[in-house]
């Protein structure tokens, strides 16, 4: 297992109107996962190639965010992120990141990745799993949390609100299908794609939050308490994405929703995003 801790001071890049920026922490933890892969694999830098020499990247398959209140963090607050990573399969790794401030855990981010490559140069629709037989690092049993994420991801990918018995998370049993809606977005090359020319995983969270805001424009924006994201595909530059809300709950506790993220050009589902938020003062 690989372990590391890094200190921070909350500034404008780390903060949003609702406290710590979820988008920032996703990107930061994503980079820490990437760097940890190199260290765990006994490499000086995160350069990976598959068995036939193609550039390979760690693509996230599942991410879980749990918070104790992003809004508690303020400008100039000191905090640290504690990272652990283990290899749980031939090309699969699992990491957990804990944001700690003043001895209190404010957020945890759990991430599962596998290595992928393109079978066609420049075509993000040709992304497939990569084989890296020479990858270093001991393989360990996945922790219970990882197993839970794998199981929920499998159930979510193959189910919908009409087949709720296949879904284990209690939230999904309370969503109402009368709120079905869609928002379309064109990913921007300057902000939504990463240096590997792939639609960045953190952009999926951003699209879902934009769809929520575009629909509701709450006077007091709610604060994320839990989010689960499962990724299945990517898009090419020029493709648009549809965020289709297939179930939603709005009550005195806050708002919750399950969104399919679809590639508009062929209708393929490229992600599921399940979100819970609470009202800021509740």
Predicted regions and their residues:
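A generic structural signal for short, non-catalytic loop/turn and secondary-structure boundary residues
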Residues: 53-58, 104, 178, 222, ...
